[in-house]
From Swiss-Prot:
Gene3D superfamilies, per database record: Helix hairpin bin
Cellular component terms per the entry's GO annotation: axon terminus; cytoplasm; cytosol; inclusion body; neuronal cell body
Taxonomy of the source species: Eukaryota, Metazoa, Chordata, Craniata, Vertebrata
Stretches with biased composition (Acidic residues): 98-134
Protein name: Beta-synuclein
Gene Ontology BP terms: chemical synaptic transmission; dopamine metabolic process; negative regulation of neuron apoptotic process; neuron apoptotic process; synapse organization; synaptic vesicle endocytosis
Superkingdom as given in the UniProt entry: Eukaryota
Record's function text: Non-amyloid component of senile plaques found in Alzheimer disease. Could act as a regulator of SNCA aggregation process. Protects neurons from staurosporine and 6-hydroxy dopamine (6OHDA)-stimulated caspase activation in a p53/TP53-dependent manner. Contributes to restore the SNCA anti-apoptotic function abolished by 6OHDA. Not found in the Lewy bodies associated with Parkinson disease.
Region (4 X 11 AA tandem repeats of [EGS]-K-T-K-[EQ]-[GQ]-V-X(4)): 20-67
Family designation: Belongs to the synuclein family.
Alphabetical UniProt keywords: Cytoplasm, Phosphoprotein, Repeat
Length: 134
């Protein structure tokens, strides 16, 4: 019986040791997972910020080009329709500079709402059922 009890005691110690190792392993795995998730999240955020900045810069460049074309086109239309004589049209203005100045002016209203706020649907009028007169 003594041998049997000693064997059970050893088995119990083995189970306790295994449980401790498992607990330690799970804790380490959870910590590594957390680190991995935080790393991926930070890299994703950096990528999004870079992407937004890149898109904003390209949009600004395109607006500058478009503004220059519109400015030149407006001058040509004004001259062609006789509103302005070609000689009277200012030649010292460069369309690219005018478009660049327009692109750099601050907006009166922000394009996006402050963080944490969302657009809400406008209130809908209640539906009234229409009954035709007999």
């Amino acid at each position: 019986m003594d041998v049997f009890m000693k064997g059970l005691s050893m088995a119990k110690e083995g189970v306790v040791a295994a449980a401790e190792k498992t607990k330690q392993g799970v804790t380490e795995a959870a910590e590594k997972t957390k680190e991995g998730v935080l790393y991926v999240g930070s890299k994703t955020r950096e990528g999004v910020v870079q992407g937004v900045a890149s898109v904003a810069e390209k949009t600004k460049e395109q607006a500058s080009h478009l503004g220059g074309a519109v400015f030149s086109g407006a001058g040509n239309i004004a001259a062609a329709t006789g509103l302005v004589k070609r000689e009277e049209f200012p030649t010292d203005l460069k369309p690219e500079e005018v478009a660049q100045e327009a692109a750099e002016e601050p907006l009166i209203e922000p394009l996006m709402e402050p963080e944490g706020e969302s657009y809400e649907d406008p209130p809908q009028e209640e539906y009234q059922e229409y009954e035709p007169e007999a």
